[in-house]
Swiss-Prot record:
Residues 19-56, 145-159, 191-212, 295-312, 541-558, 649-659 have a biased composition (Polar residues). PROSITE patterns: ZN2_CY6_FUNGAL_2 (PS50048). GO terms for biological process: cellular response to starvation; gluconeogenesis. InterPro entries: ERT1_acuK_gluconeogen_tf, PAS_13, Zn2-C6_fun-type_DNA-bd_sf, Zn2Cys6_DnaBD. The keyword Disulfide bond does not apply. The keyword Transmembrane does not apply. Residues 160-171, 213-229 have a biased composition (Low complexity). Residues 77-105 bind DNA. It is found in: Nucleus. SUPFAM superfamilies: Zn2/Cys6 DNA-binding domain (SSF57701). GO terms for cellular component: nucleus. This is Transcription activator of gluconeogenesis CPC735_053490. Belongs to the ERT1/acuK family.
Length: 713
């Protein structure tokens, strides 16, 4: 294509000289269209002007310093990009219009950097993709016909044409409608539940709902047909998921070196604060549709009803559905979804398309529950009388709003500050004293054969303990105890939140933390396990009789009071006191293999936990010496877990069989805490499967043992 074909016929220029062709190489084709054509190139490029005349500087001259500067486009179109010419921000650009290819004018594709190879193309510069869509949307909007009594009328879906769709949500029309279109195919309380999962961004802009402002009730059914034509024109124009403005992202405030990283970070934050809080009703909340189970999650600022299943959508600004809606809405069930329909729920939730989460995630009130909607008092009893409602009474019911989420009562919980750990720990923990107490307990309780097996297991890891601790000074030992207390501080929250019976003990076997479920299962109180109350247990799981307290080495004397170590601290209960003989031996043999072995390893096996039984419990169950006063004393010293469920003391001569018949089991096998207490009621042992692992400190020394138990039912 020649220059004459592009710019028209060449006009004769009397001042044109051969010197006029000495122009810079970067003169654009747009500049060539505004300046006079010069003589053919290659003729006397170095000749001087004749008769001393000089060519006047025009505004289009590339060397003119006063010429208007052309603003560089943020992204050139494909044609200008291939031609290496200056393009404009408008689409189609002026160069493509002159060439007659305005229909093919679209943004060019830039070469991505290496660190953006995995990024989708639409996510690199999303805020520049609205120009093409806006032009197409404006064209489609002006060509949508709406038939009303045989006449065509244009509906103003939006108050004004926007140069960019980012400002759409700032100019939303008023949600109240004079006369909306309602269908008799369904009632508002039986809306189909929309699936939040959406592989594509299929937000439906319903002009049949939003374009009915100011129209009478006799609006023809052709609105629904026009809505189907308008969906293609507005679906991608005003709801582009790659635009950060739709999600209220302020990318400039994010301290990221690249645009894609900031967009990804903002998207994750949006998912955590929006879709993560109320996944079942999040998609319905933002656009005024009704979620599953009739939950009244809706907003007043939305004019777009969604009907994924093809059924008509309803707008909640409608004054005619207030009476039926208020009687059927269940405000207490907004977040309690129907568990019977869980199989129909999707496995993921789509990200919302509108910037609804303007509030900070740290705010007390959920941002999804801030909008309210008022309904009218005097409404039509049936939908057949909707056409006669032309005026809305001024009397209104109280404002109906969705209830707030029940937050945890943090004020009632004790304030925990990990800084107090570093201030309170002043002395190292005496593990030597703990091992001496453990050795004395093992020799006092176990038989020589079992004692020898435990001693061999501990002797195999003794050199490793000596090698790892010989270079540690006092400051290191204090720091080791601070690490232990800090780790235990983290485990306490986990134990309280987890429903599995859990205990945490030191490497000496001393109990350091215990969960409520473990106390319910075994009857051991937390204060007794931690050494804060006397340990009156006499149940050692001996073989000479059920709960006789007699082992192969003879009777085991319980602690009559709280044992005080030479260091001044109380003596917690050892792990060996909670297990029967065989389970203790197997534990220490496994501990010898795992203590300095696999740091991430764990052991899963079976054991038998010993129930907490005092002498008063033994006498009551055996039927020898029992009285009401003794039972009251037992209730103060122990847990009272073996009392009958009726709360009355057992009479003399009452057998174990009669107590066993008082157990009440549910269909699941256990009736609450009472059923958990009945486990191991007969022989004082609870057969469990348990898993435990060893956590090490910064010096690679076994620091604590975490154990989880599950009873075998």
């Amino acid at each position: 294509m020649t220059a004459n074909a592009i710019n028209g016929p060449v006009l004769p220029t009397p001042l044109a000289t051969p010197g006029d062709n000495n122009k810079s190489a970067d003169t654009t084709m747009a500049d060539q269209g505004t300046r006079p054509e010069s003589q053919p190139q290659g003729q006397n490029n170095g000749a001087k002007p004749q008769n001393g005349q000089t060519k006047p500087m025009s505004a289009a001259n590339a060397k003119d310093p006063l010429r208007p500067r052309r603003k560089k486009a943020k992204r050139a179109c494909f044609a200008c990009q291939r031609a290496h010419l200056t393009c404009g921000d408008e689409r189609p650009c002026q160069r493509c219009i002159k060439r007659g290819i305005q229909n093919a004018c679209h943004d060019g594709v830039r070469k991505k950097a290496k660190y953006l190879h995995d990024a989708p193309n639409e996510a690199l510069m999303p805020h520049l993709q609205g120009h093409l869509y806006t032009t197409q949307a404006n064209t489609a909007r002006n060509t949508i016909p709406l038939t009303r009594n045989g006449s065509n009328s244009k509906t103003n879906f939006y108050p004004q044409q926007q140069s960019s769709f980012n400002n759409f949500y700032q100019n939303k029309p008023d949600p109240t409608l004079n006369q909306p279109q309602l269908h008799d195919t369904g009632r508002p309380d039986t809306f189909p539940s929309q699936s939040p999962v959406s592989p594509t961004f299929n937000m439906t802009a319903n002009p049949a709902a939003s374009g009915n402002q100011g129209l009478p009730s006799s609006l023809s059914a052709s609105n629904s047909n026009a809505s189907g034509q308008a969906q293609n024109g507005f679906g991608s124009a005003f709801f582009d998921p790659s635009d950060p403005a739709l999600f209220n992202f302020d990318l400039a405030s994010m301290n990221f070196g690249n645009h894609y990283g900031a967009l990804e970070f903002g998207m994750l934050g949006h998912m955590a604060t929006g879709a993560g809080e109320t996944p079942p009703s999040d998609g319905a909340t933002q656009h005024g549709s009704v979620g599953r189970s009739g939950s009244g999650t809706y907003t007043a600022g939305s004019n777009f009803g969604e009907s994924p299943t093809g059924q008509p959508s309803f707008l909640f600004g409608d004054p005619t559905i207030g009476g039926d809606w208020t009687s059927s809405v269940n405000t207490r069930n907004i977040y309690g979804q129907n568990m019977n329909n869980m199989s129909e729920t999707p496995h993921a939730f789509a990200i919302e398309s509108a910037p609804a989460n303007f509030a900070s995630p740290n705010s007390i009130e959920s941002p999804l529950l801030t909008n309210t909607t008022t309904f009218d008092d005097n409404t039509a009893p049936t939908y057949a009388n909707r056409a006669n409602i032309n005026s809305v009474p001024s009397q209104r019911q109280p404002v109906v709003s969705t209830p707030q989420l029940k937050h945890l009562q943090v004020g009632k919980r004790r304030q925990r500050n990990p800084s107090a750990i570093y201030d309170s720990v002043k002395e190292p923990y005496s593990y030597t004293t703990g091992f001496h107490s453990l050795t004395a307990f093992i020799q006092r309780r176990f038989s020589p054969q079992n004692t020898l097996r435990i001693a061999k297991a501990l002797a195999s890891i003794r050199p490793s303990f000596i090698a790892t601790t010989k270079t540690l000074n006092r400051d290191d030992l204090i720091f080791m105890e601070k690490c232990f207390q800090r780790t235990l501080w983290e485990y306490e929250d986990f134990i309280n939140a987890c429903g599995t019976p859990t205990i945490v003990c030191r490497r000496t076997g001393e109990i350091a933390a215990v969960g409520k479920e473990f106390s319910i299962l075994t009857g051991w109180k937390k204060e007794v396990l931690l050494g804060k109350e006397p340990n009156l247990n006499i149940n050692t799981g001996g073989s000479s009789g059920a709960m006789s307290g007699v082992t192969s080495r003879g009777s085991f004397t319980p602690r009559t009071g709280m044992d005080i170590n030479p260091t001044g601290r109380t003596q917690p209960v050892f792990l060996a006191e909670l297990l029967d003989d065989e389970s203790v031996v197997e534990f220490y043999e496994d501990f010898a293999k795992l203590a300095f072995g696999d740091s991430r390893g764990s052991v899963m096996t079976t054991c038998k936990l010993l129930k907490y039984k005092t002498k008063a419990d033994m006498d009551m169950l055996s039927g020898t010496t029992s009285s009401a006063g003794g039972e009251n004393e037992h209730g103060a010293a122990g847990n009272g877990d073996v009392k009958p469920e009726n709360g009355m003391g057992a009479s003399n001569g009452q057998s174990q069989h009669s107590l066993q018949r008082q157990r009440k089991w549910s269909r699941g096998g256990i009736a609450g805490e009472a059923g958990m207490n009945q486990l191991g009621f007969k022989d004082g042992k609870v057969e469990c499967s348990y898993c435990w692992t060893v956590k090490r400190d910064v010096f690679d020394i076994p620091m604590l043992i975490v154990m989880n138990f599950l009873p075998c039912i």
